[in-house]
Each structure stands twice: as structure tokens, then as C-alpha cells.
């Protein structure tokens, strides 16, 4: 049973490392899974143990460099607006460069050298 408990903890820890956002529902689910994987005698302590597991998970997760879903969504929108502005600026720059680019200057026709004796 102890190995099942450790496996569950490792799997859940790996899951959280793979995500960058804290989802309260996910914390509840993990706390429930940990609680259910405990031996029956410990599980009988009930809701108190589950609350402590949830609190421990949340405190450990706050020590990680994670962002909330709201903050992630805000940064996603900022990035999209920045990309749009960049695309517009690149297009404008191309237009300005094309407009200001001098026409290709054709070299003047070569003038044959003047031979002083022919004059």
C-alpha cells in the first residue's frame, strides 16, 4: 500500500510540473486521490486529513513558479496583440522601403574615347 501511495504522489507531482497553471479542481482531485490511496485506518480520519493534504499541496505549489489561469490568459492576449502590431509594423516598413527605394540606376552608356588624331 505504501508503494501505491508513493506512486500516486509521484504521478501527481509530475502532473503539476508539466502544467504551468494552478487549477483548484485539480488540487481537489489530487487531494482526493491521495486520501483514497491511504490505508483504511488513516482514511477514517476523514475530511481533516483531506484538508491537510489540500493545504500541503497548495503550499508546495505556491513555492513553484506557476501562474494562475487568469494571468496566463491575460499574457496570451498581450502576446496576440503584440504579434498583430509587429505584423503591421513589418508590413508598413516593407511599404516604406519599397517606396523610398531609388529606381535602379542604369549605367550611362560608355562613351568611346576620343582619338585626337581623328579630329
Curated annotation (Swiss-Prot):
It is found in: Cytoplasm. Residues 96-119 are annotated as: Disordered. Residues 109-119 have a biased composition (Pro residues). One of its GO terms (biological process) is ubiquinone biosynthetic process. Its main location: cytoplasm. Pathway: Cofactor biosynthesis; ubiquinone biosynthesis. InterPro entries: UbiK. Residues 79-99 form a coiled coil. Disruption phenotype: Mutant is growth-deficient under aerobic conditions and is impaired to replicate at physiological and high temperatures. Mutant is defective for proliferation in macrophages and mice infection and has a severe attenuation in virulence in the murine model when inoculated both orally and intraperitoneally. Deletion inhibits colonization and invasion of four human cell lines, impairs flagella formation, activates the expression of type-1 fimbriae-like structures on the cell surface, enhances biofilm formation and reduces bacterial motility. The deletion mutant is menaquinone-deficient. GO terms for cellular component: cytosol. Residues 96-106 have a biased composition (Basic and acidic residues). Keywords: Coiled coil, Cytoplasm, Ubiquinone biosynthesis. It comes from the Bacteria. Required for efficient ubiquinone (coenzyme Q) biosynthesis under aerobic conditions. UbiK is probably an accessory factor of Ubi enzymes and facilitates ubiquinone biosynthesis by acting as an assembly factor, a targeting factor, or both. Dispensable for ubiquinone biosynthesis under anaerobiosis. Required for proliferation in macrophages and virulence in mice. Significantly contributes to colonization and invasion as well as host inflammation and innate immunity after infection. In vitro, has membrane fusogenic activity at acidic pH. Belongs to the UbiK family. Homotrimer. This is Ubiquinone biosynthesis accessory factor UbiK. It comes from Salmonella typhimurium (strain LT2 / SGSC1412 / ATCC 700720).
Amino acid at each position: 500500500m505504501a508503494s501505491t501511495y508513493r506512486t500516486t504522489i509521484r504521478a501527481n507531482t509530475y502532473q503539476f510540473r508539466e502544467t504551468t497553471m494552478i487549477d483548484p479542481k485539480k488540487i481537489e482531485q489530487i487531494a482526493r486521490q491521495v486520501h483514497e490511496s491511504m490505508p483504511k485506518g488513516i482514511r477514517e480520519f476523514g475530511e481533516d486529513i483531506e484538508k491537510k493534504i489540500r493545504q500541503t499541496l497548495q503550499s508546495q505549489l505556491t513555492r513553484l513558479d506557476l501562474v494562475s489561469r487568469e494571468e496566463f490568459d491575460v499574457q496570451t492576449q498581450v502576446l496576440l496583440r503584440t504579434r498583430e502590431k509587429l505584423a503591421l509594423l513589418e508590413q508598413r516598413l516593407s511599404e516604406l522601403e519599397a517606396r523610398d527605394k531609388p529606381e535602379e540606376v542604369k549605367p550611362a552608356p560608355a562613351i568611346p574615347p576620343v582619338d585626337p588624331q581623328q579630329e
